[in-house]
């Protein structure tokens, strides 16, 4: 997964040009060049499109799908710690990772991530959950 930031110019309701910035998650980009091309394709209907930032995402996965055409859904990022026992040393070790999910509010996000944690094979705990600045996910 990659994360990109694009800027473009759009016309507001008064007819003025306005520069807008969007942060997007790319789920299936193969390379930086592929991520850049997806960003330009996404913004092809706008003028002044520019991909200003590309980076590999720290997100492990996206745990649910956005409801079809539901623009009120926000993207939340949850940090999870996975506790496991190292079979060689028999010590408990922790791995922290982040996942993204769609929800309308914090309560719904918390319920969704709790269900995700219950599906885990190992002992997992929620560290934090917060509303992200991502505008969308491109597949």
Predicted regions and their residues:
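Short, well-structured hydrophobic secondary-structure segments
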Residues: 28-58
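Short, solvent-exposed interaction modules
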Residues: 46, 57-121
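A cross-kingdom feature marking solvent-exposed beta-strand/loop segments within repeated
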Residues: 10-26, 46, 91-99, 119-121, ...
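Short N-terminal segments
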Residues: 1-4, 12-13, 50, 64
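Short, flexible N-terminal segments of the mature chain
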Residues: 17-34, 38, 99-108
């Amino acid at each position: 997964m990659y994360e990109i930031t694009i800027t473009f110019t759009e016309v507001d309701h008064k007819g003025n040009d306005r520069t807008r910035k969007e942060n997007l998650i790319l789920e299936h980009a193969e390379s930086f060049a592929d991520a850049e091309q997806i960003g330009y394709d996404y913004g092809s209907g706008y003028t002044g499109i520019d991909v200003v930032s590309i980076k590999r995402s720290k997100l492990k996965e996206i745990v649910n799908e956005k409801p079809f055409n539901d623009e009120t859904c926000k993207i939340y990022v949850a940090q999870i710690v996975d506790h496991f026992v190292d079979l060689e040393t028999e010590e408990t070790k922790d791995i922290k990772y982040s996942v993204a999910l769609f929800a309308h509010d914090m309560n719904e996000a918390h319920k969704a991530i709790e269900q995700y944690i219950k599906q885990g094979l190992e002992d997992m705990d929620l560290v934090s959950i917060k509303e992200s600045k991502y505008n969308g996910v491109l597949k």
